[in-house]
Amino acid sequence: MEKPLYPSQYMRITEGYMKGSHRDSYAIDDAGIDQGIDYLKAPYTGVIKKIYQKDANEIWLESIEPVIYPDGTVDYLTMLFAHDNDISNLFVGKVIAKGERFYEEGTKGEATGNHVHMECGKGKFTNSGWHKNNSGHWSINNAKNPTEC
C-alpha cells in the first residue's frame, strides 16, 4: 500500500475549495512556483480511467491498489486533474508509477493563467467520474476534502 504524495513540487493555491468557481466542491487550483508551466508527478501508482478533451483536458487517475489516507483508513483513491495544454502522451488504461512525471499546468479550458485544477475522490472511479453540483459546476464523484487525501 502506498501513501499518496502531493503531486506538485511547489504549492501555491490560487483558488481553494468551497469558494469562487469551486463553490460546493473540494477542488483546488495550484499554480506552482510562478506563472510558468510546472509539471506534476503521480501521487500514487495509478491507471488513467477517463480522459475528457472537450473542455480542459481532464483526466481521472485511479490508484491501482488501496492507499493509506491521512486518517489511517485504507481505500482506493481517484484524482481528477485539469488544464494541461497537451495530453497527447496520455491514454485510458495507461499505468503511471508513483513519482512519474505525467501532467503539466496549463490554460486549456476556462482557465486564467497556468495552473492545475485538482480534486480527489475516495474509492474507485464510478459512473462518468463526475456530476453537476448544486452550483452547476462539474465535480468528482465521492469527493473528499483535499486535506483528507
Question: Where are each of the predicted segments found?
Answer:
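Short edge beta-strand segments in beta-sheet-rich domains
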Residues: 25, 76, 113-116
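Conserved, short, structured surface segments that act as functional micro-motifs
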Residues: 94-149
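Surface-exposed, glycine-biased beta-strand/turn segments
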Residues: 1-62, 66-70, 98, 107, ...
